[in-house]
């Protein structure tokens, strides 16, 4: 008997821009998951699928296939606090207390040199360093955000830029009203940029008046913008606030309507139990900057207590002028080690929770959790590939632990932002080394003069 021919219709493969095939994928959502031999599918800058590699090869045909046989793929890292333009001041006045560092070194230097050119050049240098370190998004607080936006546009990184409020005149503006007006105008001009968002950025309780905070609170309510502010960075700041206002900085911010789930409190080192309760009450976010806190002698943030209170924590580097590095992987590792050591509990902040803080926790802190922070279908394709085939990372029993405790930024090989490859085989694709080297040397000579 003759068999009948099989007339089952063949399935037409789905076209995509990019298929990334690493050995391991840590999607962050769902929590604690490590996928082996899977593929991530990207089209038009969006994650469209995550599935086993064999199924991906049958279902999709991609313009580019990136095979990374000994790599782990994670969401791009998110730096929740920095001053990118200050990267040109890296190493100036090291080993000084924060107040001395600011008032006797940084602010005088800024008063002479801060400009659109300085901010653009410094931010481009910062973008280069962050991209090579696996950072795909940074949250900035500095002057001339329009100049920072030029560097963001050139480099291909994603950024949340600060609309500064500061009750001191500078080359950028005559005072807080001028800063806010200029910052809002920049935001309006760039509102359609696919990789830019904005936050209101009153500098700190000790540099911003009650009247300015009232304006910031009103603007936040009107625009829906988040608020990015230094808070409780040192005990000196708390003591000065008690002397001047009769209340702790967070108490004052609550009175002025600044605290809320849209508020990102940077550093949050000098906290007592009542402060943490107050932050939890208002669902305040925290940008934890452990290296800067240690280097400037500010102290060690109570991250264990913050975490226990349900407060979301993202990781930040602060500026390279105070930290000297924009290295989020080392920052994240230190955050975990400080918690374990100070609490004498090795079980605190396991590797997956630290990766969360450096990715989705950061996205939540910036109000961008629906767009970035995890390798989830429908989110933007911001990705970081880390090679684990080096003598310093072998053998690999747990890729998540290896990222935190063995790997470093030197193991980052590929980075994508919005589906575009901005670091390929450890080389920047949008920024030339010669350009940033020349700009950095020019500013070094100016500052020395």
Which residue ranges define each predicted feature?
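Active-site microenvironment of metallo-dependent hydrolases
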Residues: 1-38, 42-44, 48, 59, ...
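Active-site glycine- and acidic-residue-rich loops that bind
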Residues: 139-142, 199-215, 294-297, 365-367
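Metal-coordinating catalytic core of metallo-dependent amide/deamination hydrolases
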Residues: 147-269
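His/Asp/Glu-enriched, well-ordered alpha-helical/loop segment
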Residues: 255-262, 304-390, 406-407
């Amino acid at each position: 008997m003759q068999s009948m021919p099989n007339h089952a219709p063949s399935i037409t493969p789905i076209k995509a821009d990019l298929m990334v095939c690493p050995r391991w994928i840590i999607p962050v959502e769902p929590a604690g998951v490590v996928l082996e031999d899977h593929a991530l599918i990207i089209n038009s800058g969006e994650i469209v699928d995550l599935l086993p590699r064999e199924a991906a090869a049958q279902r999709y045909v991609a313009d580019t296939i990136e095979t990374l046989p000994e790599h782990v793929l994670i969401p791009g890292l998110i730096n929740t606090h920095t001053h990118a333009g200050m990267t040109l001041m890296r190493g100036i006045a090291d080993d000084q207390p924060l107040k001395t560092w600011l008032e006797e070194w940084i602010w005088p230097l800024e008063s002479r040199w801060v400009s659109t050119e300085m901010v653009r050049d410094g931010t481009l240098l910062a973008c280069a360093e962050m991209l090579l370190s696996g950072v795909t998004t940074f949250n900035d607080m500095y002057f001339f955000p329009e100049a920072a936006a030029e560097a963001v546009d050139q480099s291909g990184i994603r950024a949340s830029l600060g609309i500064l409020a500061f009750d001191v005149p500078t080359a950028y503006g005559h005072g807080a009203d001028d800063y806010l007006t200029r910052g809002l105008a920049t935001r309006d001009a760039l509102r359609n940029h696919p990789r830019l968002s904005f936050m209101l950025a009153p500098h700190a309780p000790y540099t911003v008046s009650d009247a300015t905070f009232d304006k910031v609170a009103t603007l936040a309510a009107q625009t829906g913008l988040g608020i990015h502010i230094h808070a409780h960075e040192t005990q000196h700041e708390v003591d000065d606030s008690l002397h001047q206002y009769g209340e702790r900085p967070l108490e004052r911010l609550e009175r002025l309507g600044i605290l809320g789930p849209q508020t990102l409190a940077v550093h949050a080192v000098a906290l007592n139990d009542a402060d943490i309760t107050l932050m939890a009450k208002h669902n305040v976010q925290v940008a934890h900057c452990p290296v800067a806190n240690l280097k400037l002698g500010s102290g060690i943030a109570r991250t264990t207590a913050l975490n226990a209170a349900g407060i979301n924590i993202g990781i930040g580097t602060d500026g390279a002028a105070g930290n000297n590095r924009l290295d989020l992987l080392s920052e994240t590792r230190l955050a975990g080690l400080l918690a374990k050591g100070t609490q004498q509990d090795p079980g605190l902040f396991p590797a997956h929770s630290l990766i969360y803080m450096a990715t989705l926790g950061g996205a939540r802190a910036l109000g961008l959790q629906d767009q970035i922070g995890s390798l989830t279908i429908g989110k933007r394709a911001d990705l970081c590939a880390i090679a684990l085939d080096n003598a310093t990372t072998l053998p690999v029993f747990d890729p998540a632990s290896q990222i935190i405790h063995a790997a470093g930024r030197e193991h980052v090989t590929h980075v994508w932002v919005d589906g575009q490859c901005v670091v390929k085989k450890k080389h920047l694709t949008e920024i030339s080394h010669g350009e940033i080297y020349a700009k950095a040397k020019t500013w070094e000579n100016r500052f020395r003069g």
